[in-house]
Design a protein with these regions (language model features):
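A short alpha-helical cap/connector motif
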Residues: 1-148
Length: 148
């Protein structure tokens, strides 16, 4: 799918109330109540990642309730998950379990504080889809945009 079609599909899903088909999707049922993102966010990202040239970076993957639906049945050129799970003991194992359960194995996992990674680590990749779900302070939100 080209970028304009993927974006159009994602925006349509985000605006419409018609998410019933996706509500019964086993993937969404599996994460119901376990993550902090809503179903529309998950569908929006999933539609964006249907773009055949998608290069996705998600910071703050926690249990995978956003990351896994984003990648589900998609084949992005690049996919990176960044989390150090410093505020969530035991969640890394749950994230990896969810990835295995849903057959996701084509992604890169960086287990570090995002702000402690060098932007040069990512400079060779031109990410075109970026979801930051790390620390939620206003300052962190700005830092997340500037860090890349």
């Amino acid at each position: 799918m080209d970028l304009s079609k993927a974006l159009s599909s994602a925006l349509t899903c985000a605006k419409e109330e018609d998410t019933r088909d996706s509500l019964n999707n086993p993937l969404n049922l599996a994460f119901k109540g376990t993550g902090l993102s809503g179903i529309k966010t998950r569908i929006f990202l999933n539609k964006l990642l249907s773009y055949e040239e998608a290069r996705y970076l998600e910071v703050g993957v926690f249990r995978g309730a956003t990351f896994i639906p984003a990648l589900f049945e998609n084949n992005p050129k690049e996919a990176y998950a960044v989390d150090n799970w410093s505020e969530a003991g035991g969640q890394k194992e749950l994230f990896l379990h969810h990835c295995r359960y849903f057959g996701l194995n084509k992604f890169n996992l960086i287990e570090k504080d995002f702000f402690q990674t060098s932007a040069a680590s990512y400079s060779w990749i031109k990410f075109n889809i970026y979801f930051y779900d790390g620390h939620h302070s206003e300052e962190s939100q700005y830092k997340a945009l500037e860090h890349l």
